[in-house]
UniProtKB/Swiss-Prot annotation:
Description of how the protein assembles with itself and partners: The complex is composed of two ATP-binding proteins (CcmA) and two transmembrane proteins (CcmB).
Reactions mediated catalytically: heme b(in) + ATP + H2O = heme b(out) + ADP + phosphate + H(+)
The organism's place on the tree of life at top rank: Bacteria
Species annotation: Saccharophagus degradans (strain 2-40 / ATCC 43961 / DSM 17024)
Keywords: ATP-binding, Cell inner membrane, Cell membrane, Cytochrome c-type biogenesis, Membrane, Nucleotide-binding, Translocase, Transport
Main enzyme class: translocase
GO biological process terms on file: cytochrome complex assembly
Membrane topology summary: Peripheral membrane protein
GO molecular-function terms, A-Z: ABC-type heme transporter activity; ATP binding; ATP hydrolysis activity
Compartments it resides in: Cell inner membrane
Family note: Belongs to the ABC transporter superfamily. CcmA exporter (TC 3.A.1.107) family.
Protein name from the UniProt record: Cytochrome c biogenesis ATP-binding export protein CcmA
Pfam family, one: ABC_tran
Keyword flag Repeat: no
Length: 223
């Protein structure tokens, strides 16, 4: 990220934000409520044009196929299809997006791996339950199960610990550590402490403008 600036409703959220991430990094995005943590995650994921500056992947703009094929984005919306079962959702997700290793090469995900992922997030016995019959927390677990099968090198996780219990948090932290140790990059936001070694941080509050400062940025539109 190089000299990023972003506005919302003609108000500058942050400016001159620069950071470099390398293989093995686990980075927590910090900031007060409304500071723009989710906005920054969406910018990095390529889901927002409302900024100036650059986001580079392998020294190239982060808009090409190679970048999108290398990212798993977990946002506030789970992306779970209500009419499908938990297992069908995972089949649909990996059938639509494919699964890539850290070199962005396609790899297969077996039925056994999908079922094991649901077990790991505490949904054993829910494989064939339609998601419209599940609670909000259970739907979030279905979405989190993708992480247990994904080999995408970049994980962008916006509040991944929401609606999971202590055991689930510890398990997810272990998964994040393992991903970084295998050469992946993890950017995350969280309202609770994150217990992983060598955790790096980017504090958006350090890049916020003076109170009341307005923006004259010329930016694109979200798509």
């Amino acid at each position: 990220m190089r000299s990023l600036a972003c506005e919302r409703d003609e108000r500058l959220l942050f400016s001159d934000l620069s950071a470099n991430f390398e293989a093995g990094d686990i980075v927590q995005i910090l900031g007060s409520n409304g500071a723009g943590k989710t906005t920054l995650m969406r910018i990095v994921a390529g889901l927002s044009d409302s900024y100036t500056g650059e986001v580079l992947w392998n020294n190239a703009p982060h808009r090409g196929y190679d970048f999108f094929a290398s990212v798993l984005y977990f946002g506030h919306a789970t992306g779970v299809k209500q009419t499908l079962t938990a297992l069908e959702n995972l089949r649909w997700y990996f059938g639509l997006n494919g699964n890539k290793n850290t070199s962005a090469q396609a790899i297969d995900v077996s039925e056994a791996q999908l079922e094991a992922a649901l077990h790991k997030v505490g949904l054993a016995g829910y494989e064939d339950v339609p998601c419209h019959q599940m609670s909000a927390g259970q739907k979030r677990r279905v979405a989190l199960a993708r992480l247990y099968c994904s080999k995408a090198p970049i994980w962008l996780l916006d509040e991944p610990f929401t609606a999971i219990d202590v055991g689930g948090v510890q398990q997810l932290e272990s998964l994040i550590r393992a991903h970084a140790e295998s050469g992946g990059i993890v950017l995350l936001t969280s309202h609770q402490p994150v217990s992983v070694p060598n955790l790096k941080t980017v504090d958006i509050n350090q890049y916020r403008p003076l109170r009341g400062q307005k923006s004259d940025m010329a930016v694109g539109n979200d798509y």
